[in-house]
Design a protein with these regions (language model features):
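Structured-RNA-binding interfaces characteristic of tRNA pseudouridine synthases
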Residues: 2-311
């Protein structure tokens, strides 16, 4: 369901950006969503992404085009428990958020935007929204992102009521075997073998956590944490580990793939529906701007190196 057509602007206005743009107030928003109904986070032609719903709700309230910047894009079918975005408002827009209520601007916006997003039957919901600390950038200030992935291994654990958030795997899995695989790829590496690379983008990442454990219900929960994840990286790592679990590949497969730095028929993606973006980590407020500057600088260097490699 679309709150407003993507290709029309009924307000006759555009996003801020001209030379006479007033001073802006940055807003920080934390939201969750059920990704099953959407074609991923990003806006795309002819399909509905979560970004479109959030921006259209904001545009309805603010009465102009709004662009949100996200901490990490999620693919089609992938969920988020605590996704983080930022967007900018003028002081007039910020102070006008309460309208006739006694609420402060942040809580007022929280109530109003959830009133609109509630039309999506709770598939998208804002947990927090308020004025951001100075220097905050949802994408570049982030220190790390953490994902989880649920697997019901063995048919005795299959539960139809949890199938939309759980991968069903017929055989029981040796998690000690898979944890040994996971340990072999921790650290800073070029994860090209596990990523769908984008032009001028680096595939070097620092994988801080990759662990298989059993929850109280007996199902497996996989936890992955990294400074950032490139496209398809989480699902490719889990897919590779499951090839070892099935016996189709020998132990040491993930480390071997990491060293090869190649994508081929062995680059198998795990299903998207059990994958959840759980949390985005940020430094203390007084370190936000420095972290954003450092991340941008690293990205610029990586892009320059990528271009040199094409010469």
């Amino acid at each position: 369901m679309s709150l407003q057509s993507e290709n029309t602007d009924p307000f006759g206005t555009t996003a801020l950006g001209s030379s006479d743009t007033p001073a802006l107030i940055r807003m920080r928003m934390v939201l969750g969503y059920d990704g099953a109904a959407y074609n991923g986070w990003a806006r795309q032609p002819n399909v509905t992404g979560v970004q479109q719903l959030v921006e259209e709700a904001l545009e309805t309230l603010i009465r102009r085009r709004i662009r949100v910047i996200v901490a990490g894009r999620t693919d089609a079918g992938v969920h988020a428990r605590n996704q983080v975005v930022h967007f900018d408002l003028t002081e007039e827009e910020y102070l006008g958020l309460p309208r006739n209520s006694d609420l402060e601007p942040g809580p007022a916006l929280l109530r109003r935007i959830n009133g609109l997003l509630g039309q999506q039957e709770g598939a998208v919901w804002v947990h927090e929204v308020d004025r951001a600390a100075d220097g905050f950038d949802a994408r570049f200030s982030a220190l790390a992102r953490r994902y989880s992935y649920r697997i019901a291994d063995g048919i005795h654990r299959w539960d139809p009521l949890s199938r939309q958030l759980t991968m069903w795997y017929r055989e029981e899995i040796d998690i000690d075997l898979l944890n040994a695989e996971a340990q072999s790829v921790l650290g800073r590496h070029d994860f090209l073998s596990f990523c769908k690379p984008k032009p001028r983008a680096t595939t070097i990442r620092t994988l801080q956590e990759f662990e298989f454990s059993r929850a109280e219900d007996g199902n497996i929960v996989v936890h992955l944490k990294a400074d950032a994840f490139c496209h398809n990286m989480v699902r490719s790592l889990i897919g590779g580990a499951l090839r070892v679990a099935s016996g189709r590949e020998q132990p040491g497969f993930l480390a071997e793939r990491l060293a090869l730095m190649v994508r081929d028929s062995k680059s198998i993606l795990a299903h998207p529906h059990p994958l959840v973006l759980e949390e985005v980590y940020y430094p203390d407020d007084d370190e936000l701007a420095a972290r954003a500057a450092l991340t941008r600088a690293r990205r610029d260097v990586s892009q320059t190196d990528s271009l040199k490699s094409l010469d």
